[in-house]
Amino acid sequence: MRRLVLLLAISLLLYQDLPVRSEFELDRICGYGTARCRKKCRSQEYRIGRCPNTFACCLRKWDESLLNRTKP
């Protein structure tokens, strides 16, 4: 009887849909500290690779006017 209860408990635990990824893994830093892990990159971001949790590694786009600035 104990084995039956134990098998039932184990099967119920295995039947539950356990989360594979936690929400804490979202917004992790990737890309040598310059980008973020996201499910989908935002419109102002480039996808530069994949994070260890298989999300996209998203780098924010640069403003062209900031890159071509010269001091007067």
Curated annotation (Swiss-Prot):
Pfam family name, one: Defensin_beta_2
Record has Disulfide bond as a keyword: yes
Any Gene Ontology CC annotation: extracellular region
Signal sequence range: 1-22
GO biological process: defense response to bacterium; innate immune response
Subcellular location, record wording: Secreted
Disulphide bond pairs: C30-C57, C37-C51, C41-C58
Keywords assigned by UniProt, alphabetized: Antibiotic, Antimicrobial, Defensin, Disulfide bond, Secreted, Signal
Record keyword Oxidoreductase present: no
Function: Has antimicrobial activity.
Similarity-based family: Belongs to the beta-defensin family.
Protein name, as recorded: Beta-defensin 104A
UniProt source species: Gorilla gorilla gorilla
